Design a protein with these regions (language model features):
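NTP/phosphate- and nucleic-acid-binding module
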Residues: 1-482
């Protein structure tokens, strides 16, 4: 029992070593395990269920916007990558290749999918003949492989799970509308479902997706001040259409190239969620994706235990039938206090306590994981009270994350200011940029910060470049990033 208690309580404090805290939490909360293959993790049931809830809600949103799911091969011929020069140059260092199969050397190497623009471009060239075939709105749920040198579970792994949308349109206007529509789907999902505030904006040319005309992103701030790119949406223009000869007969009877988009997000969202909301007690899971939303713990002496457990089971059935993801922990080999610590560490949003006196009074106690608030509620109003507390937990999580971001969002007019904000204060900084790639590269070299995006709604507009002092073309968010 002492060993179990140690397992629950010993988590490295965030202020002492944030990276160690993160690893402690995801391991102790049983979300993942390391595999024998470097950079690849095993999703354990609780970790994978979070991803399932993300998939379920995002699928709903994709289908509302007219998209359908499909699946494309994991293996991509090398010749496909050669057709789009920027694309292959962007991904080549990370590509694993299959060179043999069945004991024979392959005539052409096959890349293990890093993303599917090339394969899907090839298929679209076969499927699209006329304007009547457009738009094509397809999403794929898949695994992808990018051979990362430095890995971190959920946030940066050699193999990861994601969704990638790929669409084809008659013209630039429709394709750009799609690009921004899906960026907004991501923003609304991450803020409304994961309780993570994000900054939406356009990537600088050096940070664009390989082969894109324009890339847009949502950026989230972790509790160590670093950024995570939580989702991207790309306008690809006609680049892939030309490379893969995706032409259609227009309404005017002319052969035209389609305009394409792609957009994606991944299991990085799980890592982001943990880093944004977790604390020194462990995980703090947003209610809408938590595998268990309510943990029910019967308490009291042995002589009343049978009756308390029986009533707990009745309330469990009521909550479950109302669509609440609920569990009962009626173990007798650990104390209620130990259970309280365990489920706080696992991030369960709401705890329900029921004892013999509560039964007599027709009440039970609800406890919020975030605020620690205890609320005595009538059992005949339990469903309403639980749903209300779950919504309160979500709202409080969002407000806390937003407050943290506001407190760690700075403004820099000189390189010295930016260095100080990156090294000492740690967070995001707004700074002016002249548009020269060399200045952007120098900022990274001297401060370790990269441009996250050019925000659509900056808190202020900068007039001079932080690096060279020339007039600024853009106001940019800079931060160190995962």
């Amino acid at each position: 029992m002492a060993k179990d208690k140690q397992f629950v309580t010993e988590i490295t404090p965030q202020g002492e070593d944030f990276s160690r805290w993160y690893i402690d939490v995801i391991k102790k909360a049983d979300l993942m395990d390391y595999s024998p293959v470097r950079g690849c993790i095993v999703f354990k049931p609780d970790g994978f269920e979070i991803w399932e809830h993300i998939q379920e809600e995002m699928n709903r949103r994709f289908k509302e916007t007219g998209h359908r799911n499909a699946y494309f091969p994991l293996f991509i011929p090398e010749s496909f990558f050669q057709k789009e020069k920027e694309h292959v140059e962007g991904f080549n260092p990370e590509l694993p290749w299959v060179t043999e199969a069945g004991g024979d050397k392959l005539e052409e190497r096959l890349a293990i999918r890093p993303t599917s623009e090339t394969m899907i471009g090839h298929m679209y060239s076969k499927w699209i003949q006329s304007y009547r075939d457009l738009p094509v709105l397809i999403n794929q749920w898949a695994n992808v492989v990018r051979w990362e040198k430095r890995t971190l579970p959920f946030l940066r792994t050699s193999e990861f799970l994601w969704q990638e949308g790929h669409t084809a349109h008659e013209n630039e206007e429709e394709a750009r509308e799609e690009t921004m529509r899906m960026l907004e789907v991501y923003r609304d999902f991450v803020e409304g479902y994961l309780a993570i505030p994000v900054i939406t904006g356009q990537k600088t040319p050096s940070e664009r997706f390989a082969g894109a005309v324009d890339t847009f992103s949502i950026e989230a701030m972790m509790k160590d001040g670093r950024a995570v790119q939580a989702g991207t949406s790309h306008y690809l223009g006609t680049k892939f259409a030309v490379a893969f000869d995706i032409q259609y007969l227009s309404r005017e009877n002319n052969l035209e190239y389609v305009h394409t988009t792609s957009w994606g997000t991944s299991t990085r969202m799980i890592g982001s969620m943990i880093m944004v909301h977790g604390d020194d007690r462990g995980l703090a899971l947003p209610p809408k994706v938590a595998p268990t939303q309510v943990i029910m713990i019967p308490i009291g002496p042995p002589k009343t235990r049978e009756a308390v457990v029986a009533r707990t089971d009745e309330l469990f059935k009521e909550l479950k039938s109302a669509g609440v993801r609920v569990r009962v922990d009626d173990r007798t080999d650990v104390t209620p206090g130990w259970k309280f610590n365990e489920y706080e560490m696992r991030g369960v949003p709401v705890r329900l306590e029921l004892g013999p006196r509560d039964m007599e009074n027709g009440v039970c106690v609800l406890v919020s994981r975030i605020s620690g608030e205890k609320k005595v509620v009538q059992q005949d109003r339990l469903i309403e009270e639980v749903k209300e507390m779950l919504e309160q937990v979500h709202q409080e999580m969002y407000e806390r994350a937003l407050k943290f971001r506001e407190e760690h969002f700075y403004s820099a007019d000189t390189m010295d200011e930016l260095k100080n904000e990156m090294e000492e204060k740690r967070g995001f900084a707004l700074a002016g940029w002249c548009g020269d790639d060399a200045c952007e590269a120098k900022v990274k070299e001297e401060t370790g910060a990269t441009s996250r995006n050019i925000p659509f709604e900056p808190a202020e507009t900068k007039s001079t470049c932080i690096c060279c002092g020339k007039p600024a073309q853009h106001t940019v968010v800079f931060a160190k990033a995962y």
